[in-house]
């Protein structure tokens, strides 16, 4: 007699996902992209699926269904993807080279450093710091030269 009854987990689609009209789902997908990406709501730490649903006049279950079916990920992963993409740009931008990783995390909408690092690593298979260092090693001419600000003639005359 076996002690454990182990069965293989069956992959099944949530029933509510199949009830949504595909045409309506495509329309909602475009509206979600407009709000999250074009309006850059992904930068808002407090912009949840609930707030998105309110803005679209629907419920969170419907938002979840559309994001899962059309983007093949959950809402949090969907939003974090755009945050990470922007962070990648900032991390290698000479203008932001002096920013700490935590500051970049805050700029793109993560609530804390830990979730930023975890999301970044999950998507890129490296830490944000390693990503920045790798870029700088591959493009050494891209480093910002730290020089003292020169005094203008006006500043010199005021001394």
Label every PLM stretch briefly:
Residues 2-94, 98, 102-103, 119-122, ...:
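Membrane-proximal linker segments that couple transmembrane helices to downstream signaling/catalytic modules
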């Amino acid at each position: 007699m076996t002690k454990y009854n182990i069965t293989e987990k069956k992959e099944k689609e949530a029933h509510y996902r199949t009830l949504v009209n595909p045409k309506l789902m495509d329309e909602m997908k475009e509206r979600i992209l407009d709000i999250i990406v074009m309006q850059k709501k992904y930068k808002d730490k407090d912009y949840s699926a609930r707030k998105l649903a309110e803005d679209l006049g629907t419920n969170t279950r419907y938002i979840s269904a559309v994001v899962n079916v059309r983007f093949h990920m959950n809402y949090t992963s969907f939003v974090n993807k755009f945050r990470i993409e922007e962070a990648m740009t900032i991390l290698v931008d000479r203008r932001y080279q002096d920013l700490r990783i935590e500051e970049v995390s805050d700029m793109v909408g993560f609530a804390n450093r830990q979730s930023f690092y975890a999301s970044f690593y999950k998507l890129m298979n490296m830490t944000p710091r390693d990503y920045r260092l790798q870029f700088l090693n591959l493009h050494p001419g891209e480093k910002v030269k730290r020089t003292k600000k020169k005094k203008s003639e006006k500043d010199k005359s005021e001394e």
